[in-house]
């Protein structure tokens, strides 16, 4: 769908966005514009069709109404704090959500299939996904640059800055996610533990609660590879090393850690 396009010897932000998406497509992600995704309102965060298809395809005994009940349980999640809600949803994503179907026997319903070589998961990269919120009684919106959905749930938010603008830094991208998005659209970040920030030269991975200084550069795709040093090479290395679908799920499941609440820390 997209590739690196040169723009007067450099890259503008919109073309970098589509180049980034093109790299993800090459790794196996399916591209959709947020403008073409069916939602009841722009406050809706989940992609209902993908979520329900995965649950139905992996639980053939469930009725359509039961699948909708599971969807509503995840869609209407609530907890005492933003951090607690994020932790609760992450636990569902990794371990499944408990549900009692019409036979009366409670069981765990997986929301992601972590089995090696699974072909059940739906990997979707989305841009132009407008998220609505209310500010002093007025409807406003935010539009993250790129979101990565697995089975209709946005597991990673990606914020990109113009590689041609020396004043646009990855710190600005970090502030956009970890400050402004938490302030305005926390209902998106409740489902979205991972965060990536990039300006083409520097690309870093963290979580939506990670301090800026702890965001991590992915230097190699595999052990023994040469360290990436060229512009855009670091981006490609991050995408191949982190976002190849099977590897992405492994990182998502095994490398996200929530601090114990007794230490009064909301870091992930």
Task: Report residues per predicted region.
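ATP-dependent helicase/translocase motor core
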Residues: 2-268
């Amino acid at each position: 769908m997209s590739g690196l396009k040169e723009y007067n010897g450099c890259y503008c932000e919109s073309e970098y966005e589509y180049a980034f998406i093109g790299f993800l497509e090459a790794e196996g992600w399916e591209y959709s514009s947020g403008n073409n995704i069916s939602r009841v309102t722009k406050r809706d965060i989940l992609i209902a069709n993908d979520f329900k298809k995965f649950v139905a395809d992996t639980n053939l005994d469930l009725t359509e109404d039961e699948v909708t009940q599971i969807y509503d349980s995840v869609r209407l999640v609530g907890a005492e704090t933003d951090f607690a809600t994020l932790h609760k949803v992450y636990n569902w994503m990794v371990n499944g959500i408990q549900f009692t179907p019409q036979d009366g026997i409670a069981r765990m319903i997986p929301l992601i299939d972590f089995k090696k070589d699974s072909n059940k998961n739906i990997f979707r990269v989305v841009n132009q996904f407008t998220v609505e919120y209310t500010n002093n009684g007025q409807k406003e919106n935010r539009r993250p640059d790129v979101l990565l959905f697995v089975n209709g749930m946005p597991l990673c938010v990606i914020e990109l800055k113009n590689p041609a603008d020396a004043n646009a830094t990855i710190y600005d991208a970090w502030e956009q996610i970890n400050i402004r998005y938490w302030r305005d659209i926390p209902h998106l970040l409740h489902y979205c533990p991972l965060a990536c920030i990039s300006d083409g030269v520097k690309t870093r991975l963290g979580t939506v609660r990670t301090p800026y200084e702890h965001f991590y550069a992915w230097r190699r795709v595999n052990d023994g590879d040469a360290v990436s040093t060229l512009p855009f090479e670091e981006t490609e290395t991050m995408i191949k090393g982190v976002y190849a679908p099977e590897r992405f799920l492994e990182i998502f499941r095994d490398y996200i850690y929530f601090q114990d609440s007794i230490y009064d820390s909301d870091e992930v």
